[in-house]
Curated annotation (Swiss-Prot):
GO terms for molecular function: aminoacyl-tRNA deacylase activity; ATP binding; proline-tRNA ligase activity. The lineage of its organism: Bacteria, Pseudomonadati, Pseudomonadota, Gammaproteobacteria, Pasteurellales. GO terms for cellular component: cytosol. GO terms for biological process: prolyl-tRNA aminoacylation. Keywords: Aminoacyl-tRNA synthetase, ATP-binding, Cytoplasm, Ligase, Nucleotide-binding, Protein biosynthesis. It is an enzyme of class 6 (ligase). This is Proline--tRNA ligase. Catalyzes the attachment of proline to tRNA(Pro) in a two-step reaction: proline is first activated by ATP to form Pro-AMP and then transferred to the acceptor end of tRNA(Pro). As ProRS can inadvertently accommodate and process non-cognate amino acids such as alanine and cysteine, to avoid such errors it has two additional distinct editing activities against alanine. One activity is designated as 'pretransfer' editing and involves the tRNA(Pro)-independent hydrolysis of activated Ala-AMP.
Length: 571
């Protein structure tokens, strides 16, 4: 491609409303342009990258035995009503009525559509297992679109759905897809972790997220220093450290009128925060027990996903308000504790091994110090309620935990029969009876992958694509003063034609621009291999080569240039 025939839309300045690096660089590199909140036009440079990512995904999915289909973005409401998600999905589901007064949605996902398709097309267990995928536009009416294409309202997604006669067959395909995803992200050159995850609104049992490690990520990714253990912080098991020690002091009731929070208590009474506990009151799951207390160490955070899975706790988790707490317990939020508590309590594992700790007295303006289990309070039910912290023991007993930020780019689920049962998707089983199909679901955010690659791979000059395979162009020809030098123009034209004939994705900068502008643009869009052709070097039989990824510069003999590029460039 010649720049003179290309829409080369780079910007010198960073737009003020772009918060994260990927958004800034995608705008500056001329990859995207905003149209409305959360909606973007993809320009030629961006679409080249997007299509290359799609092709890698497509190739690896095909290798894994999946079959490509394409389903409509517009979906009839009846399918969502049939699955039960019409009322459950929430405001992200964009609904509309057509001219025939029929309800439709813009698809945020395609579980209903694929289940309907397969129940119509597949009738016998002999046709299973079946794994179908598509690369298609999705729409989710995000309440606050942000971070460019990282969290936009319209995006491209690869979603696959597998159908099976039983869980054993599903597990086989799930394992294959786990490996396929690992192959995809490895081929893309990304530093990622496959982590245990919560199934969320999709439903089902087993689930893994594929997280690209980046400081701008929205998720906390937990992994061991000495094993393959990795999990989203929502699911990472927190292990209690040490054993409970014997009491060393008598319990005291202390006036604490100005200590309404753990931090105020610690500061005013010079207590180690690890020797305090906090009591959180949440809604219970039953009318008989409308309120439940969750008790954590003062320096730990409640893990809401873990808490709401407890049978006593309402799902979704909901905190009780001040009036409810005061009416039931008789004290305000800042004075709650485990002594004489009149609602069921669940304590975190780390609280169960504490001794001589401080907690609220369930009397406003008072706390107990030097509290000990069994001596001063009966030991309540113990459960894993908290988020892990860096340095915690790994739950597999190998090493300690590290925590890094991650960008979720892929997610695989074992759905089971959640959708097939609701939508009566059955086949004739081996025994001749109707058999509800067991399902798996496998998604990759294609547009998000592009942004995640930039978040992880960039410098002050622009994008550094982690793989030649996804760069918009693999080679840039940058001729110095070509329009004033016949030898430079002749060599550049000949090199361009040769590389094109060899199938190299090459951009030839034939603009009448200063060399500095040309270099800056090619570095900004992240072309991994730059060939600089100058009149003086050419006369000496040499060509300058620059590697965007390593920063290396070297002179290559003119007659060795093609061989050098063939060896170093992945076309």
């Amino acid at each position: 491609m010649r720049t003179s025939q290309y829409l080369f839309s780079t910007l010198k300045e960073t737009p003020n409303d772009a918060q994260v690096v990927s958004h800034q660089l995608m705008l500056r590199a001329g990859m995207i342009r905003p149209m409305a909140s959360g909606l973007y036009n993809w320009l030629p440079t961006g679409i080249k990258v997007l299509k290359k990512v799609e092709n890698i995904i497509r190739e690896e999915m095909n290798k894994g035995g999946a079959i490509e289909v394409l389903m409509p973005v517009v979906q009839p409401a009846e399918l969502w009503q049939e699955s039960g998600r019409w009322n459950d999905y929430g405001a992200e589901l964009l609904r509309f009525v057509d001219r025939g007064s029929r309800d439709f949605v813009l698809g945020p996902t395609h579980e209903e559509v694929i289940t309907d398709l397969v129940r119509r097309e597949v009738s016998s267990y002999k046709q299973l297992p079946l794994n179908l995928y598509q690369i298609q536009t999705k729409f989710r009416d995000e309440v606050r679109p942000r971070f460019g294409v990282m969290r936009s309202r319209e995006f491209v997604m690869k979603d696959a759905y597998s159908f099976h006669v039983d869980k054993a067959s599903l597990q086989e395909t799930y394992d294959v897809m786990y490996q396929v995803y690992s192959n995809i992200f490895t081929r893309l050159g990304l530093d990622f972790r496959a982590v245990q995850a919560d199934t969320g609104s999709i439903g089902g049992s087993a689930s893994h997220e594929f997280q690209v490690l980046a400081s701008s990520g929205e998720d906390d990714v937990v992994f061991s220093t000495e094993s393959d253990f990795a999990a989203n912080i929502e699911l990472a098991e927190a292990v209690a450290v040490g054993e409970r020690q014997a009491p060393t002091a008598e319990m005291q009731l202390v006036d604490t009128p100005n200590a309404k929070t753990i931090n105020e208590l610690v500061e005013q009474f010079n207590l180690p925060i690890g020797k305090t506990v906090k009591t959180l009151i949440v809604k219970g799951a039953t009318e008989e027990q409308p309120l439940v207390a969750l008790v954590l160490r003062g320096d730990h955070e409640l893990n809401e996903i873990k808490a709401q899975k407890h049978p006593l706790v309402a799902d979704p988790l909901e905190f009780a308000d001040e009036a409810e707490i005061k009416a039931k317990i008789g004290a305000g939020v800042g004075s709650l504790g485990v002594i004489n508590l009149n609602v069921p309590a669940i304590i975190d594992r780390s609280v169960a091994v504490m001794s001589d700790f401080g907690c609220g007295a369930n009397i406003d303006g008072k706390h107990y110090f030097n509290v000990n289990w069994e001596r001063d309070a009966a030991m309540p039910e113990v459960a894993d309620l908290r988020n892990v912290v860096e340095g915690d023991p790994s739950p597999d007993g190998k090493g300690v935990l590290q925590i890094k930020r991650g960008i979720e780019v892929g997610h695989i689920f074992q759905l089971g029969t959640k959708y097939s049962e609701a939508m009566k998707a059955t086949v004739q089983g081996e025994d001749g009876k109707p058999l509800v199909m067991t399902m798996g679901c496998y998604g990759i955010g294609v547009t998000r992958v592009v942004a995640a690659a930039i978040e992880q791979h960039h410098d002050e000059r622009g994008i550094i694509w982690p793989s030649d395979e996804i760069a918009p162009f693999t080679v840039a020809i940058v001729p110095m003063n070509m329009h004033k030098s016949e030898s430079v123009q002749q060599f550049s034209e000949e090199l361009y034609r040769t590389l094109k004939a060899q199938g190299v994705d090459v951009i030839f900068d034939d603009r009448k621009e200063r060399p500095g502008v040309m270099f800056a643009d090619m570095e900004l869009i992240g072309v991994p291999h730059m060939v600089v052709i100058g009149e003086k070097n050419l006369a000496n039989g040499e060509i300058e080569y620059k590697n965007r990824r390593t920063g290396e510069k070297q002179m290559i003999a003119k007659d060795q240039l093609l061989a050098f590029l063939k060896e170093n460039v992945k076309a």
